[in-house]
């Protein structure tokens, strides 16, 4: 597998070593071997809300270091136009539509998430990796 887009919830599970999902997710990442993982600016935005709200500079730094391990996936205007199509056709929330559109734009082989709703709209691209 080539490039895998990581949804924000998964990056949060990794950074905060989620009690239920942290270890299974780390194992799933280790199992794919040669794959690269990518994140968008939207993922970074969603992830940083918690540490900023709590005023936790240590966790902010942990996120920043984790972000550096992933390929950055830009979100140019065509991503937003595709997201509008996805919202119109599948009723996705704006952030979910943007995640999916970004993964499609960059030709990702998969979009890993913990959200079953994305799987229906993605025609097999998105999958709940923790299900």
Each predicted region: which residue ranges?
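Short, well-structured N-terminal submotif of metal-dependent ribonuclease cores
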Residues: 1-39, 51-62, 130-131
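Acidic, PIN/NYN-like endoribonuclease modules and their adjacent C-terminal/linker elements
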Residues: 1-3, 27, 69, 100-131
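Alpha-helix capping/helix-boundary segments
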Residues: 10, 43, 79, 99, ...
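Conserved SAM-binding loop
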Residues: 14, 72, 92, 111
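Acidic catalytic patch
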Residues: 17, 69-89
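Active-site charged/polar residues at nucleotide-handling catalytic sites that mediate phosphoryl
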Residues: 32, 90, 106
């Amino acid at each position: 597998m080539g490039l895998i887009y990581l949804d924000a919830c998964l990056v949060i599970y990794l950074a905060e070593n989620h009690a239920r999902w942290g270890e299974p997710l780390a194992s799933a990442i280790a199992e794919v071997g040669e794959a690269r993982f990518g994140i968008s600016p939207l993922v970074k935005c969603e992830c940083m809300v918690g540490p900023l709200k709590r005023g936790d500079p240590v966790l902010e730094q942990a996120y920043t270091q984790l972000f550096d391990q992933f390929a950055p996936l830009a979100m140019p205007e065509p991503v937003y136009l595709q997201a509008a199509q996805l919202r119109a056709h599948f009723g996705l929330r704006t952030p979910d539509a943007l995640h999916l559109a970004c993964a499609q734009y960059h030709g990702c082989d998969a979009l890993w998430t913990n959200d079953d709703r994305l799987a229906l709209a993605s025609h097999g691209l998105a999958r709940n990796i923790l299900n």
